């Protein structure tokens, strides 16, 4: 309750759920501790979430509506990203595998390093500015599996300067 800021002290596992009424728009900034979480879940609905840094072994981000902006994400385990009709922007500096499901929203991801992306059938996705389609292979543990039937996904695998 500090002008829309939520400051979280170190805990091993955390679930943050933000639900607001649709006619109101809230911007909530979350300051997380420097040490990584073993399990971190960030869920937003009809609100705007902004995080400077997120670090954890298992990180799940779900954006039903509204937006989620994450300036730096480090995930040493499994990453789960689920966007319904909202917008997610994030920069990922550590990644070891996971999935991205986007229904009708917009997802923009910048990777610090090259990341192997596996696209499912019927998905619209742009990788490094070029339209990408499924090559028919199955995702492995260290891949980012992307499913987006009618939303927009943009992925850059360039080093952020």
Please give the residue ranges for each predicted region.
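A mature extracytoplasmic/lumenal domain signature
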Residues: 10-12, 34, 46, 55, ...
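Generic recognition of long tandem-repeat/solenoid scaffolds
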Residues: 4-16
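Short, surface-exposed interaction patches in beta-rich subdomains
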Residues: 70-161
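Short, ordered beta-strand-loop transition motifs
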Residues: 1-7, 138-139
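Right-handed parallel beta-helix
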Residues: 40-84
């Amino acid at each position: 309750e500090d002008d829309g800021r939520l400051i979280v002290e170190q805990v091993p596992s955390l679930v943050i759920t933000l639900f607001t009424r649709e006619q109101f728009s809230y911007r909530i900034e979350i300051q997380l501790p420097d040490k990584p979480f073993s399990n971190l879940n960030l869920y937003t609905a009809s609100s705007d979430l902004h995080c400077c840094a997120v670090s954890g072994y298992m990180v799940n981000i779900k954006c039903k509506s509204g937006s989620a902006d994450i300036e730096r994400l480090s995930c040493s385990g499994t990453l789960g990203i689920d966007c319904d009709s909202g917008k997610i922007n994030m920069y990922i500096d550590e990644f070891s595998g996971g999935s991205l499901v986007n229904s009708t929203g917009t997802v923009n991801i910048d990777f610090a390093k090259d990341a192997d992306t596996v696209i499912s059938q019927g998905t619209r996705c742009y990788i490094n500015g070029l339209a990408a389609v499924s090559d028919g292979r199955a995702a492995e543990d260290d891949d980012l599996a992307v499913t987006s039937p009618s939303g927009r996904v943009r992925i850059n695998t360039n080093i952020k300067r």
